[in-house]
Amino acid sequence: MYWYSAGYLARNDSRKCQYTVAFPASCPWVTSVGGTMNGQGGTSQRGEPVALEEWGANSEETKTMFAKITSAGGFSNHFHTPAYQKYAVEEYMISNAGKRAKSGYNRSGRGIPDLSANALNFQAWIDAGPATISGTSGSAPSIAGMISVANAQRGKNGQKRLGFLNLLLYNHTTAILNSIVHGYNNCTAGSQLINGTDSTVCCEEGFSSGSSEWDPVVGLGSLSYLKLMNIAQ
């Protein structure tokens, strides 16, 4: 079983905005993990898990502040939509017909991410000292750890391992995942120096979350360990 960070896929130059996904996160045999953060009271409730959001009067300022993490997502140009995901992707295409871009990405491609987890403010040890890091490089290991603990518990109970996680996720979405209804992923992660100003680049188009069971921002939502253990007995 493999988990992989969906990564930061927006280009750091607004003139080169394009839809793209990375391998191996886009492989149908990999569980792709996106990222969330706690809402700051903008379009969401404070503390509610969201993908990147804007809030406050100064949108440029908030884009810089809250593009510290961004959940990459989209559709593969190399892999077709796998059978286990087909219904979820088709539902997204129909329910978001008036919101999403009509072109620029492969509508019949493998969609990522599959699910998401918190990607903000992980405590780490870097270069002989403590550090705080953020990104899907934190959320992917979090999911891997949850599944490893679940498999260990199942082993103690004399049960088989969970196996290929994607089948479980898409077949039991509402039973084991929590919906993420706010956020988008059209901005780059972090910030960069543009014309002497530290700013985040946001493309005119991107994907948003919340209007279907699965979306190319947070996937099916965030995994509940307790719900997973109940459904997987």
Label each PLM-derived region with a short phrase.
Residues M1-Q233:
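Extracellular protease catalytic domains of secreted zymogens
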